[in-house]
Design a protein with these regions (language model features):
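Macromolecular interaction modules
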Residues: 1-258
Length: 258
């Protein structure tokens, strides 16, 4: 979550600006996407927001107080990720190209940007529809999902990435659909310093509270918000997805991100 000294817009500016100017220069990084929680509440601020409430269930009342945004870091190998925070040889100096020590610190603004230290998790990514980005901002929605224990992990995954995703992939105006399933693989040890707040008792409790509400993030990119509301609430699609979600999900709710 953002530092209490920052407004949400100031957090966005600080993360997108200064912090990401170093994060995108981490050694061997292949991709970096920052998602900041939108100022618009998808369940309240649109003409058809009431529809979102109809397909959402078991969202914690304080969920938005637990996150301000999340970055997605892509590396070829785990070893590249764990050694990424090193000085980068990409700064012009009086004697030619120099190492920039601030890249190793990712700008050194953690205590001013965040409330406590951030935490990170590994995901298994399944690309259902590759993201096609036109030259303008897309309408991006995250569906936070928690699986119930009705099905085995293998069977649930086959249903989620099979019939459920296939139905969603046919929505008009859809520019991308990606499923991210959180794993238990440790990507924090040796990336953050041992004394970081995220390893303290308070930090662990904060992280576990956030995790208990979801284990899957489904990312939707739409050409605009009108396509989301018209396509996602198509009667035939809605009938199918509602049956699936009521049977196999413990919780499901939606958030717009920039």
């Amino acid at each position: 979550t953002k530092n209490e000294n920052l407004t949400h817009d100031e957090y966005r500016a600080g993360h997108v600006g200064y912090h990401n100017s170093f994060g995108r220069r981490l050694n061997n990084i292949r991709g970096y996407t920052l998602n900041v929680r939108s100022n618009q509440n998808i369940a309240e601020d649109y003409i058809n927001s009431s529809l979102v409430k109809e397909i959402s269930f078991n969202e914690p009342t304080d969920f938005d107080n637990q996150w301000s945004g999340y970055g997605q870091l892509m590396f070829d190998r785990f070893e590249d990720y764990i050694t990424a925070k090193q000085p980068a040889l990409d700064k012009a100096g009086p004697n030619g190209l120099e190492f920039d020590d601030m890249v190793a610190k990712v700008g050194g603004d953690f205590e001013h940007l965040y409330s406590g230290s951030p935490f990170q998790f590994n995901v298994n990514e399944a690309i259902i529809v590759p993201v096609m980005r036109p030259e303008h901002k897309l309408f991006k929605v995250i569906q936070f999902v928690k699986q119930n224990e009705v099905l085995s992990e293998i069977l649930f995954n086959s249903y989620l990435k099979g019939t459920y995703s296939e139905a969603l992939s046919k929505m008009d105006g859809l520019q991308g659909l990606i499923i991210n399933q959180r794993t238990s693989f440790d990507v924090m040890t040796n990336f953050f310093k041992p004394e970081s707040e995220c390893f303290s008792n308070e930090g662990v409790l904060r992280r576990e509270k956030f995790y208990e509400n979801w284990d899957i993030m489904i990312e939707y990119w739409f050409y605009n918000s009108d396509y989301f509301f018209s396509s996602r609430f198509n009667k035939n699609l809605l009938s199918f997805t509602k049956k699936f979600e009521e049977k196999y999900l413990k919780s499901s709710f939606y958030k717009e991100v920039d």
